[in-house]
Amino acid sequence: NFKGKIIHPGTDCEMDEDGYGVSKKIASDWIVKSGSNTKIIKTSIIGPELHSRVSLLEWFLYQTGEVEGYTKAIWNGVTTLEWAKQCKNIINNWEVTPTLTILYSNNISKFNLLLTIQECCQKSDVIVIPKELGKDKSLKGNVRVKDIKEQIIELFKFYKK
């Protein structure tokens, strides 16, 4: 009989109708109904990677020249540092935390998100070109965190230590 506590990472991909999105939705629904020792943090994250450069942040940091930023791809996720802070908060307040926590920050287009990252890390070797593409993948949340620009500044400061 398992007595441990688990924080399950949810995702904005539950909106997708592919196998991954459907499986994440099924898992999330089951945990909400039956997972007494589990909390879900649903959000979308950006942050550094250890071994690849496929996520938005790492991909962008290694680009030069022109890159496209999608003006219709709306996002309101959090940095990995903010996600970790929220995990700590849930652990410290387990009994009063709802099973499902949906983190959200300000809505921002991927175009403006790239410009924000560029500004925060003073990246001058890339030009972000707006492209009208994408869809709204913002989440309706129940825990508002600080604006993404503040989070990105904190993230870069944290990793410069």
Name each model feature, range by range.
Residues 5-10, 39-42, 102:
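Structural signature of the Rossmann-like NAD(P)-dependent dehydrogenase/reductase core
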Residues 122-161:
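C-terminal amphipathic/interface module of NAD(P)-dependent oxidoreductases
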Residues 2, 34-35, 121:
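Helix C-cap/helix->beta junction micro-motif
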Residues 50-55, 113-115, 139-140:
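Short aromatic-enriched loop/helix-cap "lid" or pocket-rim segments at secondary-structure transitions
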Residues 19-21, 25, 29-77, 82, ...:
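NAD(P)-dependent short-chain dehydrogenase/reductase
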Residues 80, 110, 144-148:
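Amphipathic alpha-helical segment in the mid-to-C-terminal domain
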Residues 1-21:
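Conserved Rossmann-fold NAD(P)-dependent oxidoreductase catalytic core, especially the SDR/UDP-sugar
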Residues 84-136:
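Mid/C-terminal beta-alpha module of Rossmann-like enzyme folds, strongest
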